[in-house]
Amino acid sequence: MPQTIVDCANGVLRDSEKHIITKTMAKELLSRKQSFFVKPTVDSCSGQGCVKADQGAKIEFSNGAMSLNGNIYTQYFVIQELIECNESLQRIYPYAVNTFRIITYIWKDSIQHMPISLRIGRGGKYVDNAHAGGIFVAIDENGVICNHASTEFNENYERHPDTGVKFEGYKIAQFDKVLATVTRFHEAIPQIGCINWDATIDKDGNAIVLEANTSDGGVWLPQMAHGVGPFGERITEVLQWLRFMKKIKPHERGRFTAGRMG
């Protein structure tokens, strides 16, 4: 995960060690950083509220909220160190943290994943979300980009519009670490059936998980990027299980999780 400088949970400020701190202490911690990244941690999506700020930013803390250059964050937010992507990701677009969207799900006795997408910034923006103007491409399990990039409006690009990098066949170095990391993380929390992970690779080659989204995740991104369904050849089996689960009383469904029907 990116290194936390300050976070706020239920209006309570904490440092990187999860110790409760005062408003003065929080401002002191931020004053030591040349730049940092701020984002809400609850009920947020599509890069909304994500802000990159510098040391001279106007910051005020008050009653479980923070004002940053006029942007208001309440109750739940995090302030993190900046991440620098590895060379192969930076070469495509250097101004954003380009991230992999990997949707994992538990099916019977293993962690499976839907088709993988790489989200990429453009136009000088430092966020890569499709709803914020970014583009996305299909990527295979070896870290190779499969085809052209698209926008959410199905505008297609054979090359990145800013850097000119050709997409199809481009290989992302050390991608295997990302896939292994999110799989291992999901194994640690089997109570959650499906997780939308946002992850990247830093300049030192480490897999970095930025977010684990456990609700409101959509399958439109991998479907649009790859042109295939999210469950592939497993789709018939999944639909049969869903039909079966509709007949089971809610309080009895725990016995039939992850594709089990008997």
Language-model features and meaning:
Residues 1-100:
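Active-site nucleotide/adenylate-binding loops and adjacent lid/helix of ATP-dependent enzymes
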Residues 8, 40-42, 81-83, 104-106, ...:
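Short, flexible loop/turn elements at secondary-structure junctions
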Residues 36, 112-114, 208:
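Protein kinase-like catalytic core scaffold
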Residues 45-56, 122-133, 157-164, 239-250:
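Short secondary-structure transition/capping segments
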Residues 54-66, 128-144, 246-262:
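A short, terminal or domain-edge coil/loop segment
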Residues 73-74, 81-94, 107, 112-115, ...:
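A long amphipathic alpha-helix within ATP-dependent nucleotide-binding catalytic cores
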Residues 156-183, 187-192, 201-262:
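C-terminal active-site "lid" helix and adjoining low-complexity regulatory extension at the edge
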